[in-house]
């Protein structure tokens, strides 16, 4: 469809059949596998995208890979993405049938495909990446390189995300805060950022080091838009991990893992933010098979007991 930053361009948009590339003919001949590979893939029997999607799906059928994160998805047309998705769905079923004793063989979820397209966000809606490209989720650039709002104003984002994402089970957004392409979302209270991100509706991802307070590369210039010299892409801070911050992110992350309502449920504010009691909200989820409800408070003062009214979900005596 187009070339990315001068990198070689596979003509996936062309539908005519092509022969096996000379470089592979040479490689397979030298390996002594040419006849075997031609018998498997054919010679002059498919388009560029036919070959590429077949080869990529072999990672799935051979190793049981159950998902791809596809970078710069806009550089490949939707039909080729859909072709890849369909082949990978079939390949994963084959792997599970052929490897019944291996981990993941008894899972029933189809192959998952997440796409990345710069500036794509919740406002992009349930667009052609989903309907034509076969993507299950798209990365959400809404918060790229930016901290999430304070507890006093985060209800609007929670409500918007829940209303937009969780009203359509085929529309998924993968949200993050820090990025190697924009900035590290650092504030004086990264524990709160962990709470806000882990309690966000939809899917979330942790960019390495957000949970441990990783810094940029010392002494390396940063231009504010991706970083000159890749200062944002510093090594993981294994020797200087903020253990208190990590423990908090792990605690809230575990809560999210244990409660599907956090990411997939409907959102309701219980009490607006107050400096003395924080901000309290509920999430409810029921798909007819699984039912889950939670109430959470964030932004409350440290080391202070607060009373939370849970009667909207649980009556007295509920265990």
Q: Model-flagged regions — what are they?
A:
Residues 54-173, 186-189, 195-200, 212-318:
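Active-site-proximal helices and loops of the catalytic beta/alpha 8
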Residues 43-47, 185, 240:
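Short, surface-exposed alpha-helical recognition segments that flank or form part
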Residues 45, 170, 176:
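Acidic/His-rich catalytic or pseudo-catalytic neighborhoods
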Residues 1-63, 84, 88, 93, ...:
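Substrate-binding/active-site clefts of carbohydrate-active enzymes
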